[in-house]
């Protein structure tokens, strides 16, 4: 379970198009990873709308309990980041809210998600899927809702609303939602590995610093640079992250 904090900021359409290099009613969706919640799991997002921006962070509750920084302060720090600050300058806050986001995937789904006259959809069904590259929330909720609608229509037509679970389970398993849930069922555990938020950012930072160093010595060959920092940051742990990613993503 994660906590999402979102703020909606007002900005003229022309300014949005200029800052995000958009035209012809295009939109942009930016996802951020790294030290959003210090060196603990967490991410952030910035979406463009017609005349507003949607900006926020999403951090697992386990990260928030370990972090010494309040959740609201994490959002403030994210907004002040040099990569984000120019994109949201001269905006006005219109909305501010928080929401618990279930990102556990397939293994967090309730065993019984329908019954006598009731069924679960959306967050209650745990239909949000974090693929590690994108977060599929709204589209998967709509896909689950379509399966729910098909179930209710069939139950009403046959006058059998007593036990919806067998039919709903059948419709969910036939939907895109089930395919996506199965495909990325191990990703939630993969994203909890601390290396993604601690070791990998430090590795990339060290390599970039040495690669662009303008000191009095020539820059070492790239392969030598990579090998040096890979060993220094723990080659086998990094290799484990890569192997798991190739297996699960």
Regions found by a protein language model. Give the residues of each.
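Predominantly flavin-linked oxidoreductase catalytic cores and closely associated redox partners
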Residues: 1-87
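Exposed alpha-helical structural elements
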Residues: 4, 73-74, 83-87, 163-167, ...
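Short coil/turn segments at secondary-structure boundaries
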Residues: 19-21, 89-92, 181-188
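FAD/FMN-dependent oxidoreductases across multiple families
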Residues: 37-40, 50, 63-147, 151, ...
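Short secondary-structure transition/capping segments
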Residues: 47-51, 55-62, 130-139, 175, ...
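C-terminal segments that line or cap access tunnels to active or ligand-binding sites in enzymes
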Residues: 52-56, 137, 156, 160, ...
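Active-site-proximal substrate-binding core of FAD-dependent oxidoreductases
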Residues: 128, 143, 147-199
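C-terminal auxiliary extensions adjacent to catalytic cores
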Residues: 189-249
């Amino acid at each position: 379970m994660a906590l999402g904090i979102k703020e909606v900021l007002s900005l003229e359409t022309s300014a949005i198009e200029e800052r995000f290099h958009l035209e012809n009613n295009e939109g942009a969706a930016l996802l951020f990873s790294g030290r959003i919640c210090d060196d603990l799991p967490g991410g952030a997002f910035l979406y463009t709308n017609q005349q507003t921006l949607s900006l926020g962070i999403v951090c697992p509750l386990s990260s928030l309990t370990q972090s010494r920084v309040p959740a609201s302060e994490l959002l403030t720090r994210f907004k002040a980041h040099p990569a984000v600050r120019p994109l949201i300058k001269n905006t006005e806050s219109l909305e501010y809210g928080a929401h618990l986001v279930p990102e556990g995937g397939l293994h967090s789904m309730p065993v019984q998600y329908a019954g006598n006259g009731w069924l679960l959809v959306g967050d209650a069904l745990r239909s949000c899927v974090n693929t590690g590259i994108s977060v599929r929330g709204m589209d998967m909720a709509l896909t689950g809702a379509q399966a729910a609608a098909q179930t209710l229509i069939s139950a009403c037509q046959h006058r059998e609303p007593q036990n919806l679970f067998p039919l709903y389970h059948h419709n969910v398993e036939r939907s895109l939602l089930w395919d996506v849930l199965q495909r990325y069922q191990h990703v939630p555990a993969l994203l909890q590995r601390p290396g993604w938020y601690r070791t990998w950012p430090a590795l990339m930072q060290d390599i970039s610093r040495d690669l662009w160093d303008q000191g009095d010595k020539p820059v070492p060959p790239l392969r030598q640079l990579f090998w040096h920092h890979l060993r220094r940051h723990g080659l086998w742990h990094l290799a484990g992250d890569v192997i798991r990613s190739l297996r699960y993503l």
